[in-house]
């Protein structure tokens, strides 16, 4: 099942349920991460951006934006990975994970 740990602002579930092909997934304030990826600092930063997005948008707001963006890209001929990488919430999380910058604040 895996270890569930409380951290400031989120719960981390190492060994929790993660979709096939993914290293981690965040639902609300719970970050589920594969054991092999638990030490990946960039991945954790990425997932913590999702925690902030869930908090900012709420459950329905996050899911609506995420799923509609994914569906739009799929409907426009992109495969799963390409559509996923174009979801604005994923783009934001990846940018902040790589740069440490939150350009929305400026």
Question: Model-predicted segments: where are they?
Answer:
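Metalloprotease/metallohydrolase-associated module, dominated by Zn2+-dependent proteases
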Residues: 1-26, 35, 58-106
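Short alpha-helix carrying the canonical HExxH Zn2+-binding catalytic motif
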Residues: 37-53
